[in-house]
Amino acid sequence: MTWLITGGAGFIGAHVVRAMLEAGEQVVVYDDLSTGDPARVPDGVPFVKGSTLDRGMLDRTLAEFGVDGVVHLAAKKQVAESVALPLHYYRENVHGLQTLLEAVTTAGARRFLFSSSAAVYGLPDVDLVTESTPCTPINPYGETKLAGEWMVRAAGAAHGMATASLRYFNVAGAATAQLADTGVFNLIPMVFEKLTQGHAPVIFGDDYATPDGTCVRDFIHVDDLASAHVAVARALEARGDGTDLTVNIGRGEGVSVREMIALIGEVTGYGPDAEPTVLPRRAGDPARVVASADRMRTELNWTARRDVREMVASAWEGWCLYHPEARR
């Protein structure tokens, strides 16, 4: 099959491209480069610079490359920014997806994988979040992802297209230093940045109902996340047209913010310098969000293989590639 991977020049997208190629699939990368880097696109892989809001460019790309399936990763994804710029997020994430689905269904593509998020769950009050846990997003970003799931499912049902929504938990790590996340919007790179600048990492709240009082999250290595896309793509092919899947992509194991910062101090060699400063809670931070990974394991025979230490170590190698002054 030939897969169009939107956002394929981004951090996660580049890993998905790599996994699909290794699985023997043909890939076309489609990215507007607002946050992506064309250097992440492998040699020999067709690259089209374009927006999912550009119907004409989408139509031409789908026709030129004979696209059979789509992995849609292109989106705006910063929670705080979505609160400040909600209409921008709805335009990019919802209207952009609508435009893409219109083009894809017109072109006759048969498979569609949608990059969703654990943000659709909002503030779940359960030990393990299953795919049937109620979805009550608490910010525009999460709302756009839930609306996206609805649109993808409805389009698939109407047009006989096999669809899947993959709800990512906390993505970390890197397959290679060159593919590492260069942003500082997630916990691990945020701690790296603080340590590099000579500042203490920050914990927002240590009075949660968790073992050490700090928030607990489920971290997934980006390489495992990428392999999950291959597993889901294979499942859609096996199950046929009209299939719809919704799956959590996580490890099913919680790590507290304090535990993660301590591990970062150990892996990076910063040790005592990684002792965090504790500030008051941020509004809207749930105490615990950890995936139940049972559906991926039992129905698709997929499990995450890499542990949290591998995530931190590989992310650190990437950070030091771009910030050599950070290494001790």
Region roles according to the model:
Residues 195-328:
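C-terminal substrate-binding subdomain of Rossmann-fold SDR/epimerase-dehydratase oxidoreductases
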Residues 38, 169-187, 197-217:
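Short, flexible, glycine-rich and Lys/Arg-enriched loop motifs at helix boundaries
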Residues 59-63, 189-197:
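Short amphipathic alpha-helices and their capping/turn segments at secondary-structure boundaries
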Residues 90, 138-146, 181-189, 218-219:
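Short-chain dehydrogenase/reductase
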Residues 1-167, 171:
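N-terminal Rossmann-like NAD(P)+-binding domain of SDR-like oxidoreductases, especially those catalyzing
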Residues 84-85, 140, 177-182, 287:
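Short, solvent-exposed loop/turn segments at secondary-structure boundaries
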